[in-house]
Amino acid sequence: MYRFAPSPTGDMHIGNLRAAIFNYICARQKNMDFILRIEDTDKARNIAGKEEEIKEILNLFSISWQHYYIQSENLKFHRQMALKLVSEKKAFACFCTEEELEAKKELAKKQGKAYRYDGTCEKLADIDVLECEKPFVIRLKKPTHTMKFTDFIKGELSFEPENIDSFVIMRTDKTPTYNFACAVDDMLENVTCIIRGEDHVSNTPKQEHIRASLGYNKAMTYAHLPIILNEEGVKMSKREAHSSVKWLLESGILPSAIANYLIMLGNKTPCEIFTLEEAIKWFDISKVSKAPARFDLKKLLQINREHIKMIKDDELNKILDLNKDLAQLAKFYTQETSTIKELKEKMQAIFNAKDFGEFETEYKILKELLKDIELFENYEDFKNELLNKSNLKGKKFFMPLRIILTGNIHGPELSDLYPYIKNFIHELARI
């Protein structure tokens, strides 16, 4: 069982989407169920509407799920599991205040040591715990042995007990910490493989320790994906516009192109342009590079152009939403545009009212002729017919004709454009 477990705290990051895509692909390859779990336990940071936005984005990428969970609905199970650990003396109540802990952290810092919980409350007698009325958290006792696990990308990783520490699993308000809720949910939902970003590597031994302490002995496999760098080679920030999946989509980049690019990013693929369904046939998580991958917007736009060309005409017409059969004309314009947004602007420039400036007189002459002109198969025949009937020459002929046909003073060769614009010429003459 594979899962994607985002938090509804902001726009989906391309790193999150990459994890979703990889989990989905592997689930399909293994013929296993795929889980979508919304991790909403951080109520202060949750943003209204983001849960639905996550589902909408996954649907756009043709990522479907068989099971859907809301983490906060598992709160009773989180509390039951925490109580079980306390009753078995595997976890304990900690009454240390934030101020006390902060003072100890400062002391460790001055001594040049990494702070570790010193066990102040670990050996409190039961009666002392019962009689103490101070707020408390619950800490899981640190493991007694080295924690090891194998990662499909990073190989074998190990963590010593002192580096895992006796960490908090339940807060003073009786809500679970991220690691505890995540570990318990993965256990309850029978997740068998976790693919996520490498920023979660340090969480893995804690989650393994939680499940082991609860007596869960089913093996879990992992793949921690390397970080994505920006074009300057620095870790991509969530504040950077093109790190947001929503921004990429709104910019007119197709979901299929984004998926293509993210699968290819830092990976060995048999070809450069492919669909998600094609990738399912050959994708191998172990071939993903350990090294950070650098995001290249120009490369993504190049891939997007190819995916626009691959779209079926009726589907592209729906996307353009201009109530015309413009698919072939739009695909022709991919030579100078890279996104659906740019294509729409090109199409609107062609079919909207135009400013002819100094060529207003010539425009009126051409407009009348174009309303009924014979639409020859060959551009040269069309051009010569129009030249002869208009008595216009040079710039005074070609510039207004270009504006009529393209809405711009610059653009593709009219001879190249003609086969795609021909059927619209009578209409353009009446705008």
From Swiss-Prot:
It is an enzyme of class 6 (ligase). Monomer. InterPro entries: aa-tRNA-synth_I_cd-bd, aa-tRNA-synth_I_codon-bd_sub2, aa-tRNA-synth_I_CS, aa_tRNA-synth_I_cd-bd_sf, Glu-tRNA-ligase_bac/mito, Glu/Gln-tRNA-synth, Glu/Gln-tRNA-synth_Ib_cat-dom, GluQ/Sye. Pfam families: Anticodon_2 (PF19269), tRNA-synt_1c (PF00749). It is found in: Cytoplasm. This is Glutamate--tRNA ligase 1. Catalyzes the attachment of glutamate to tRNA(Glu) in a two-step reaction: glutamate is first activated by ATP to form Glu-AMP and then transferred to the acceptor end of tRNA(Glu). GO terms for molecular function: ATP binding; glutamate-tRNA ligase activity; tRNA binding. One of its GO terms (biological process) is glutamyl-tRNA aminoacylation. A motif ('KMSKS' region) lies at residues 235-239. Keywords: Aminoacyl-tRNA synthetase, ATP-binding, Cytoplasm, Ligase, Nucleotide-binding, Protein biosynthesis. GO terms for cellular component: cytosol. The lineage of its organism: Bacteria, Pseudomonadati, Campylobacterota, Epsilonproteobacteria, Campylobacterales. It comes from the Bacteria. Belongs to the class-I aminoacyl-tRNA synthetase family. Glutamate--tRNA ligase type 1 subfamily.
